[in-house]
Regions:
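Generic short N-terminal amphipathic or hydrophobic helices
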Residues: 1-2, 20
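Bacterial N-terminal signal peptides that target proteins for export
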Residues: 2-14
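Hydrophobic membrane-insertion alpha-helices, especially the h-region
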Residues: 15-19
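Conserved functional micro-motifs across diverse proteins
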Residues: 27-186
């Protein structure tokens, strides 16, 4: 009887530990929830985070990015680009490479985080309206087969824009939807 009780309590503790570990791993890991595959590339993206400021640190210097006007916000999308088939794919991540918006035609281009940022003295702490975007995904990249590159893309979007899709249009056109446009809204 004592052996059976100890076995049940050990099993209960083990089950509780496994449940807790599963919960913490799933809650604490950043998930790139959405992805689409094209002919040569895979694009994976997280749901856009809308903030009023974004910053990154490069060579010990902190730089901050702000929206271009008071009626705009920054949308940050963590993006991963994967080369599955071609030997080497040259990719140019620039304003024309990615747009964010909805399938009804309202879109905003990615902004150059290096040109739009301003150097600040001192440190800045992330909070719900200020986001750290290290590493930044921008510039010329040669992506070999079987490799991937990840980073943050920044968009200067009007307030109220429906951020339903990121449209990747470098090498090939790949839209990645964050919302279900075809769901019956009855």
């Amino acid at each position: 009887m004592i052996i059976f009780t100890n076995f049940r309590s050990t099993l209960a503790v083990l089950s509780a530990c496994l449940t807790a570990i599963t919960f913490f791993v799933s809650c604490n890991s950043e998930q790139l929830d959405f992805g689409r595959t094209g002919r040569n590339l895979e694009i994976h993206a997280s749901r856009p985070q809308v903030v009023s400021k974004a910053f990154y640190t490069q060579d010990g210097i902190t730089r901050i990015i702000t929206p271009s006007a008071s009626n705009r916000k920054l949308a940050v999308v963590n993006t991963t680009i994967v080369n599955r088939s071609s030997t080497v794919i040259p990719i140019s991540v620039d304003p024309d490479a990615a747009t964010l918006g909805d399938r009804k035609g309202k879109k905003s281009n990615a902004i150059d985080p290096f040109a739009r940022s301003k150097e600040i003295s001192g440190a800045i702490e992330p909070d719900p309206d200020v986001l750290e975007i290290t590493p930044v995904l921008w510039g010329e990249i040669e992506l070999s087969r079987g490799f991937q590159v990840s980073g943050s893309l920044v968009f200067d979007v009007p307030k109220g824009l429906r951020l339903g899709t990121i449209f990747w249009d470098e090498v090939e056109y790949i839209p990645v939807d964050f919302i279900d446009y075809w769901r019956d809204n009855d």
